[in-house]
Amino acid sequence: MQTAQINGTTIAFEDTGGTKPAVILSHGFLMDHSMFDAQVAALRDTHRVVTWDERGFGGTKATGDFSYWDSANDVLGLMDHLGIESAVLGGMSQGGFLSLRAALTAPGRVEALILLDTQSGVEAPETVEPYNQLHAAWVEHGAVAVQDIIAGIILGPV
């Protein structure tokens, strides 16, 4: 993987390169850029495809608190670093959250959105608490300690 300094963070990414129309894919929570390997293989002959690891996942470390707005600025900064003026942004789950925010931040740079299993609204109050518990447990005890909380969020009560 390549890396670039974007907004004070070392962002890990892969880029098929070239001058073809650009597609930038942002992964979901608890995943990394490799979730899009099949899509990269399918698109690489007709598009420049960029996948990246968002803060706190894969090869990109989280260096402090950040928001989806920060992540949106990361993808726009990555576009600047790669000399990509505009692109189709695709995102799954949290990747969709940040892709939507990038489109709101810089609408002239986003040609289209590909949104998978994501939403544009605010989380319902009853779903916020499990995420707060997840965050607190992760910060205090690490990723292994949160597997039951994650299972509950994904699968319902266990």
What does each model-found stretch correspond to?
Residues Q5-G64:
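Conserved HGGG/HGGXW glycine-rich cap/lid loop of the alpha/beta-hydrolase fold
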Residues W69-A87:
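Conserved acidic catalytic loop of the alpha/beta-hydrolase fold
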Residues L89-G91, L116:
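Short beta-strand immediately N-terminal to the catalytic nucleophile in serine-hydrolase-like folds
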Residues T118, Q133-A137, D148-V158:
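Helix-loop "lid/cap" segments that line or gate small-molecule binding pockets
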Residues L100-T105, V110-H141:
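Flexible "cap/lid" loop of the alpha/beta hydrolase fold
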Residues A22, T46-R48, E85-V88, R109-A112:
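Structural signature of beta-strand start/N-cap positions in the alpha/beta core
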Residues G91, G95, S99:
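Gly/Ala-rich beta-loop-alpha elbow adjacent to hydrolase catalytic centers
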